[in-house]
Amino acid sequence: MLGDQQEMQNKANRDFRDLASEEFDTRTLLRNAEEQAIVRKYEDFLIVDVDSHHYETEAFKEIAEYIDNPVMRHEARYQGASRGGLWSEGGMYQEIGGRITRYPGRKNEKVPASPHRDITLMGRWMDAMGVDMAVMFPTPMLNLSACPRIPVEVALSKAYNRWLCDKILDADPRIKSMLYLPFHDPEATYEIIEEFADRKGVIGFMVTSTHYRANYDNAYMKSYAALQERNLPLGFHAAFTWSDQSLQLCNRFIGVHALGFSWCNMLHMTNWITNGMPERFPKLKTLWIESGLAWIPFMMQRLDNEFMMRTSDCALLKRKPSDYMREMFYTTQPMEMVDRSEEHTS
């Protein structure tokens, strides 16, 4: 009996994988996903990941060289982009104290000298999961809009967009992007659209929704017109910031993360619709990215109810808010899965 138990323990010890210490490789991490993709015959149809992310801060030294202002470029080289860096405002909680091993592990993942590291890493997870095409977004830079120094946001967004186009999009046709717009500076926003709209792999432009700018401000109208003329969509990419005054009432990260991603896009969508942007720019496609889906029917009902009681407050609208919302596009991550056990589905 004791011998059998010891043998079982020895086998368990041999099979144990220490993910924190072993050499990290995306292909190993996603081995099961690759097998599932084969079984499910993903190669038989087109799959597009419309909200994929990379960690642009790992290439921050390269991005910094694209900053026009020499003083700010020197500052970026010196400070970097980590906590306390050029734009950061707080700590990181999403890796759950290191228990999500991909965050620290991917930094040490070995890749060939070419193509660019980000292209290799993107390709590995795309191939493993059966994804044909991916729309790449930054990750830490989603909170660049919270930077109190507007010139820093402008400089870094231009540098990042130039680096992304030169190093990534020009080199791999499977990777696309909606480029970052420095929304705190309307003129710079327009300039970026003019500069990058025709670059290879650019399929639209993106606003990070943690900003505190009114999207109905007339200063942005020429940017919206430029996008509509080119048939390029405008995305509002959700994020969170614990510095938001309402979210500061949350004492746990789970509350900030659950509410923040939906709340910011609920606010901007309300302003977008009630100020008649869908009527002013009827051919401009809008996307609401990574804020989930559960809030959409709630917003439809709520805005329609208000609209029917005070239609005069939305003089530009010719239809109910929900009608405009049905013509918009949405992405969700994660899939907002709930308990599907029999007791909940019967």
PLM region spans:
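Helix-coil boundary/capping segments in enzymes
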Residues: 1-346
